[in-house]
Amino acid sequence: MGIRKYKPTTPGRRGASVADFVEITREHPEKSLVRPLHSKGGRNVYGRITTRHQGGGHKRAYRLIDFKRADKDGVPAKVAHIEYDPNRTARIALLHYADGEKRYILAPARLAQGDVVESGPGADIKPGNNLPLRNIPVGTVVHAIELRPGGGAKIARSAGASVQLVAKEGMYAQLRMPSGEIRNVDIRCRATVGEVGNAEQSNISWGKAGRMRWKGKRPSVRGVAMNPIDHPLGGGEGKSSGGRHPVSPWGKPEGRTRRKHKPSDKLIVRRRKSNKKR
């Protein structure tokens, strides 16, 4: 993937860039693997906003992605197409299995149209192949990793994401996450060799607010810019600091949204480095 920069013909074009899509081999998805997707606009079943800054955007169709692949062990598949998926940052690959079935998977880097991939304990260590962690050599870079055997891929699924297998001890494999955290995962869990493709996606400059609206993202307004009826930090004469610690629109302290004690914390071997200022 490459990035194409626009000439500054308008204020919205100035500094904007877009993917060149050279790896895309087909424009329309496989109809049998597409499902309708209803836009919720950040609302729940009662019509109340539960997630702010969402809504609008282009209509999308959901592509069914195979995050398990265990039921296709030993069945080779040919990469028929590399396609665009509006629901994720990664590209997706359409596989034609030898038994006639078609499925989508996340397209790893260096996977091209015409390549053959397979899954199972005996698969080769090459991009796109899916194996249990116990059958993958230490030091291998992997993505789309399960947290529980048979649970489907949960870790490292976005564009450019990868995890390194650094050790195996007993029933656990140690994985180095992109954050630097080292975590134990059941050695029976499956992973796909290689890193997720489309790594340059993070370097795209959107250029204007309208492009984010096309993606379904609405503006985020600062609390200090609101009126006091709308936010605890609102109001004041001129530009104010808000006069208190940052809080949500409902008065709860900003940040600290994660649980202090998660059951899976015992599987963390080494914590990620904190960015807090000492």
From Swiss-Prot:
GO terms for molecular function: rRNA binding; structural constituent of ribosome; transferase activity. Keywords: Ribonucleoprotein, Ribosomal protein, RNA-binding, rRNA-binding. Residues 210-278 are annotated as: Disordered. GO terms for cellular component: large ribosomal subunit. It holds the Pfam family Ribosomal_L2_C. Residues 210-220, 257-278 have a biased composition (Basic residues). GO terms for biological process: cytoplasmic translation. PROSITE patterns: RIBOSOMAL_L2. Part of the 50S ribosomal subunit. Forms a bridge to the 30S subunit in the 70S ribosome. One of the primary rRNA binding proteins. Required for association of the 30S and 50S subunits to form the 70S ribosome, for tRNA binding and peptide bond formation. It has been suggested to have peptidyltransferase activity; this is somewhat controversial. Makes several contacts with the 16S rRNA in the 70S ribosome. Belongs to the universal ribosomal protein uL2 family. This is Large ribosomal subunit protein uL2. The lineage of its organism: Bacteria, Bacillati, Actinomycetota, Actinomycetes, Acidothermales. The gene is rplB.
